[in-house]
Amino acid sequence: MTTSPLITAKNINHAYGNKTVLNDISLTLHSNEIVTLIGPNGAGKSTLLKILLNLIQPTSGEVTRKTGLRIGFMPQKIQVDASMPLSVQRFLELGLARQSQTLFNKKTNDTTELHEVINDLKLNDLLTHPIQQVSGGEMQRILLARALLRNPELLILDEPVQGVDLQGQTELYHYISEIRDKYGCGILMVSHDLHIVMRSTNKVLCLNQHLCCSGLPQTVSGSPAFQELFGQGFEEVAFYEHHHDDRVCTHTHGHTET
């Protein structure tokens, strides 16, 4: 049985003054589905995210959201003042629905689920560490965990593997795939990498003001050339081959615009 969409965007257009940044964008996000939105810098990805999150209204077009939709958002990165005494555990607790909760308060209804998230993302050994001292890959797992704390129906990940090496990307993609399978949430993942995407992605959307193309990723981790360059153990990584429409799409693959 087909479930109702979590978010449906129809014919979205947006401009800042005389500059058009989104042109006739339509997309649908469902539960149990991973959609990867790719495009160069300046393609309109951040603006589209803000519209989907209801932070800004489009110049024209319509966005329909499931009633009471719970959204978890993972930002690209955060900056925490080095002088702030903030542990990983306390950082996660600040994301709870009720500020009186703690991760290990046995009286809360969410305790089991919180423990599951921490265990799933292998954060137990990091809970007492200062948040400022964790590595880039560890921080991404922490941000992902915090986005999951309110049991979202839709998880939006903004550049989740930015600044993470290929091994770290593979591990994070593995966690994201497990989250989709375990919790059944829809996932929208945003990336400026125009070729390398998560293998478990159900659909890739290529944005450059308009949707240039869409399709499925092709696995490349088993190819001899890929293994020679990166080694083995990167089964979560895949390649997306672009098939652009007849409208102008000016980005150069393999490079990002300034």
Swiss-Prot record:
InterPro entries: AAA+_ATPase, ABC_transporter-like_ATP-bd, ABC_transporter-like_CS, Metal_Ion_Import_ABC, P-loop_NTPase. It catalyses: Zn(2+)(out) + ATP(in) + H2O(in) = Zn(2+)(in) + ADP(in) + phosphate(in) + H(+)(in). It is found in: Cell inner membrane. Residues 7-233 form the ABC transporter domain. One of its GO terms (biological process) is response to zinc ion. GO terms for cellular component: plasma membrane. SMART domains: AAA. Pfam families: ABC_tran (PF00005). The keyword Zinc applies. Its EC number is 7.2.2.20. It is an enzyme of class 7 (translocase). It is a peripheral membrane protein. Keywords: ATP-binding, Cell inner membrane, Cell membrane, Ion transport, Membrane, Nucleotide-binding, Translocase, Transport, Zinc, Zinc transport. ATP binds at residues 39-46. Gene3D superfamilies: P-loop containing nucleotide triphosphate hydrolases (3.40.50.300). GO terms for molecular function: ABC-type zinc transporter activity; ATP binding; ATP hydrolysis activity. The complex is composed of two ATP-binding proteins (ZnuC), two transmembrane proteins (ZnuB) and a solute-binding protein (ZnuA). Part of the ABC transporter complex ZnuABC involved in zinc import. Responsible for energy coupling to the transport system. Belongs to the ABC transporter superfamily. Zinc importer (TC 3.A.1.15.5) family. This is Zinc import ATP-binding protein ZnuC.
